[in-house]
Amino acid sequence: MASGVQVADEVCRIFYDMKVRKCSTPEEIKKRKKAVIFCLSADKKCIVVEEGKEILVGDVGATITDPFKHFVGMLPEKDCRYALYDASFETKESRKEELMFFLWAPEQAPLKSKMIYASSKDAIKKKFPGIKHEYQANGPEDLNRTCIAEKLGGSLIVAFEGSPV
């Protein structure tokens, strides 16, 4: 079901910047986004970047000790959101970083909001080619490390964001 909602150019630019890892200086790496939250504009016609709802790679270890916990804390309790999260995890063989796309639709969100976000999900996903991991979370219990590790590769995952699972 299409909603007719558009996706802002800035959303596409942020996705591209997060997906493409070009050789960068240490300062440029610190400015790269670790997580970004997107919301609907006030008129509900466009998906935009939510002001102030991002984590920069340079914040991790400096002002943010647990980036995933901080990311979960940025999600509203009673409304829906989309998000991109640059997940760092380890398998038994190697260390990996992959983008995850989230639809956050908590139980307490208004029904109309859930319907608009669900019906607009395809519009934003089409702007994010190559996303390997898509996840819908309906409450904080869906966003624990075990659930995310399962989504990323199940028993092959030994650590997520530096913490054992």
From Swiss-Prot:
Keywords associated with the record: Acetylation, Actin-binding, Phosphoprotein, Ubl conjugation
Gene3D superfamilies found in the cross-reference section: Severin
Any one cellular-component term (Gene Ontology): presynapse
Entry annotated with the keyword Ubl conjugation: yes
Positions bearing N6-acetyllysine: 19
Gene Ontology MF term list: actin filament binding
Transmembrane parts of this sequence: none
Keyword Lipid biosynthesis: no
Positions of modified residues (Phosphoserine): 3
PROSITE patterns given in the database record: ADF_H (PS51263)
Any one of the GO BP annotations: actin filament depolymerization
CDD domains with a match to the protein in the record: ADF_cofilin_like
InterPro entries, A to Z: ADF-H, ADF-H/Gelsolin-like_dom_sf, ADF/Cofilin
Residues in ADF-H domain copies: 4-153
Post-translational modification remark: ISGylated.
Motif (Nuclear localization signal): 30-34
SMART domains: ADF (SM00102)
Pfam families: Cofilin_ADF
PANTHER family in the record: COFILIN-RELATED (PTHR11913)
Role according to the record: Actin-depolymerizing protein. Severs actin filaments (F-actin) and binds to actin monomers (G-actin). Acts in a pH-independent manner.
Family stated for the protein in its record: Belongs to the actin-binding proteins ADF family.
Protein name from the UniProt record: Destrin
Protein's organism: Mus musculus
Gene: Dstn
